[in-house]
Amino acid sequence: MAIGLIGRKVGMTRIFNEDGASVPVTVIEIAANRVTQVRTLDTDGYRALQVTTGTKKANRITKPEAGHFAKAGVEAGRGLWEMRLADGEGEGIEVGAELNVDIFADIAKVDVTGQSKGKGFQGGIKRWNFATQDATHGNSLAHRANGSIGQNQTPGRVFKGKKMSGHMGAERVTTQNLEVIRVDAERNLLLVKGAVPGATNGDLIIKPAVKA
């Protein structure tokens, strides 16, 4: 696993490349990620970096959090995230260090993880892209009904995992192999081609693409 960073979705825009083609991009703000803890095989049984970013009001910080941030010698952030490390990764990174967007300067593609927009309770047509039933020809009540959900007396039940109506969205989603269009180290911005999960101002985890 490669070292990733925590960012914030600013929104979408478009830029023009050298050929004059319009490229849709998502702007991700990646403020300095401050290392709050370095987990090791000896003490924790696995290797990882724990980071925070952003700020948090003093009256919103619990005493355990305050002690944890004080021990690391970093400003309290809006949350804590961990990045697993493979052997040989993260060597030399110590508690209190800052990781910035420039680590993506030589990266061509990234994977972006976020929480998708919540859609509430939705039917099968919106949630699973089911086809609608007949608009006419005797159909009066079942235009958007799911249809059959099983077989017969055997098996006599609905299988687990059957696609049906239910809560849609608000779940962890990863979009893979997004092309890095631009890295703006001065303004802490990363521009990637296409859309990323979640709403504006949502937290994102950006890592070098595993399938690149």
Swiss-Prot record:
Top-level taxon of the source organism: Bacteria
GO biological process assignments: translation
GO molecular function, one term: structural constituent of ribosome
Reported modifications of this chain: Methylated by PrmB.
UniProt xrefs under HAMAP family: Ribosomal_uL3_B (MF_01325_B)
Homology family: Belongs to the universal ribosomal protein uL3 family.
Subunit (UniProt): Part of the 50S ribosomal subunit. Forms a cluster with proteins L14 and L19.
Function summary: One of the primary rRNA binding proteins, it binds directly near the 3'-end of the 23S rRNA, where it nucleates assembly of the 50S subunit.
The protein, known as: Large ribosomal subunit protein uL3
Organism: Shewanella pealeana (strain ATCC 700345 / ANG-SQ1)
Name of the gene this protein is made from: rplC
